[in-house]
Regions:
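Intrinsic-disorder-associated, low-complexity terminal segments enriched in Asp/Asn/His/Tyr and depleted
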Residues: 9, 13-15
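N-terminal intrinsically disordered, low-complexity, charge/repeat-rich segments that act as generic
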Residues: 14, 23-106
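Non-DNA-binding regulatory cores of transcription-related proteins
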Residues: 104-169
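Short coil-to-beta-strand transition motifs
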Residues: 124, 172-177
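Short, compositionally biased
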Residues: 133, 181-185
């Protein structure tokens, strides 16, 4: 399984399944997407509340300018506009996840919608979901931490087209890390 140039023979004796719980047949990608949607709904709820607070602050009688240099109301209106944009972005993210078509990537190259487990040369495993948006989001699924990546992120771009068992290098700054794609579905 490992034993290729990046990892060498030192890992032949390690049972990777002990390091990472491989996805069982009971792991349901629809369940993972639903957890992501739930977290995005919470993000939207918070964005709505923040927008309302910013609107209230912008229209409060105490923010009426007392002189030409008093910019509190103007600043509050900018904040309200920014918060409203956050609401729109959150609604768009939810639309994208709700309309996702669930695909199986077991025998296919990695693409948007794939669940991927990577192991680096230090035997550190991480789980990723390649989503249409919301990169940076982290969710708990099947007692595991899953990081949401987009195809636009450096790691997301590197993963696109890879298949289970492939190895690749990622250079970030002056550090190069080697990974193996252990699981894809």
């Amino acid at each position: 399984m490992l034993g290729k140039p990046f990892f060498g023979d030192r890992l032949e004796y390690i049972n990777i399944s002990c390091l990472l719980s491989a996805p069982s047949k009971s792991m349901n990608k629809a369940e993972l997407i639903q957890i992501i949607i739930h977290q995005l709904e919470e993000k939207l709820r918070i964005a709505h509340a923040s927008t309302q607070r910013a609107i209230d602050a912008a229209t409060d009688e105490e923010t009426v300018p007392e002189h030409k240099y008093d910019t509190l109301a103007l600043e509050a209106s900018y904040l309200a506009h920014g918060q409203a944009m956050r609401v729109q972005e959150s609604e768009d993210e939810l639309r994208q996840y709700r309309s996702m078509v669930i695909r199986d990537f077991t025998d296919a190259p990695i693409g948007v919608g794939a669940y991927v487990v990577l192991v680096d040369e230090n035997n550190i495993g991480k789980r990723f979901f390649i989503g249409p948006c919301s990169g940076g989001l982290t969710v708990a699924w099947q007692d595991q931490e899953v990081f949401v990546l987009t195809a636009k992120s450096p790691l997301g771009r590197a993963l696109l087209g890879k298949e289970e068992g492939e190895e690749f290098e990622m250079k970030i700054g002056d550090k190069t890390t080697c990974y193996e794609v252990v699981t894809v579905f």
